[in-house]
Each structure stands twice: as structure tokens, then as C-alpha cells.
Amino acid sequence: MTAPFDPAAVSSLAQQIAEHVGPLDGVPAAHLQLWLPDLTAPPAWTVAAVDGATVTRLLLRRLNSGTHWDGCEVLNLYRVPGVVPEALVLDNADRILRDSAATDIRSCRLEVAPRYGVIATRASGVLHSGDRVVRSQFHHYVVNTNAGGALIEQAIVIGAEMLSALDSEVNELTENLYRSLLTSIDRAPQRRQA
């Protein structure tokens, strides 16, 4: 039997970066298009609000019911006051999954051309919440520049019974974020890496 989920016992890469570099400044939903103007979402995913929590973007996908979601994306974008060490990102990419007692955890570095100066990771695992089983993916993108940096966290959670039905839409969400980030970096005037 697994222990009850305790949100206070779960930490994230963002918390680790804040402890190492300094307080992060969350980018509000209204400013997301300024940072990632090409970011879109699959048509059936709807924007939602979260009571008591601040997120840059929350998308929900319902297939069979209006009473619960079958897919969820939480996207957070933060300004970072300093340089984030690569090892910190790589060592903590799966932290939220480990702290949540997920199973079948996998974590890897994503390849990004060196000219972008992006540290990118993907971690996935299976979470059990009561009688519900969900597959979770976490993508992290850290951009270091001389003027500070940015952290993008993308969490996608899909009900295990809907994995095959939503697979292409999940791929669209992750690929669109990746491409939008690189396009935004390409457009930035005289970007200098730290």
C-alpha cells in the first residue's frame, strides 16, 4: 500500500533553482504570448483557471465526460535572476515524480542545438491518486543569458485509460512548446549566452 499523497513533501525543479539562484518571478498568463508568441494548443484543449494557484497556462481535455478531465497541461514560465547550473537541472528533472512516489520513472536530457543555450529535460512516470492512475510527463527548459534566464515547466498528466486516444495531442503540445521556444530565441535581438 502506498502512503497518502502529501503535497507539502513534494518539491520541484523550480524550488531547487530558487534555492540555488534566488527567487523566481512567475510570468502571468497575460504575458505568455509576449514570451512565446507562436505557442498554440490542440483545438479540443480548453484554457481553465485554478483556484488558489498561479499558473501561466492550464489546459484541460475531456473526452468522455464533462465531470472530470482526461488530460491536463500545466505550463509555468519564470524569470530567473542568475545562471542555472546544468547539473542542477539534470539532477532534479524527475524530482517532482520521485517526491510524489511515482513508479516507472524515466528521465533524459533533450537534445537542443548548442547555439540556443538551452538545457532541456524530459521526465515521465506513473502516478496513483486514489483509484485513478495517470501518466505524467514533465518537460523543463532553462535558458541562461547574461541578463538572467528563464525556466519553462510543462507538466502533462493523462488518465492511463486515455493514453492511446490522446497520444498525438500530447505530442502536439510538447512539440509546439519546443518549437515556440526555439523560434522565440531565434527572434531575440543580439542574445548572449551566460
Q: Positions of the model-derived regions?
A:
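N-terminal targeting sequences that direct proteins away from the cytosol to non-cytosolic compartments
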Residues: 1-70, 81, 127-135, 143-194
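Signature of long, low-cysteine stretches enriched in small and polar/charged residues
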Residues: 91-144, 183-187, 191-194
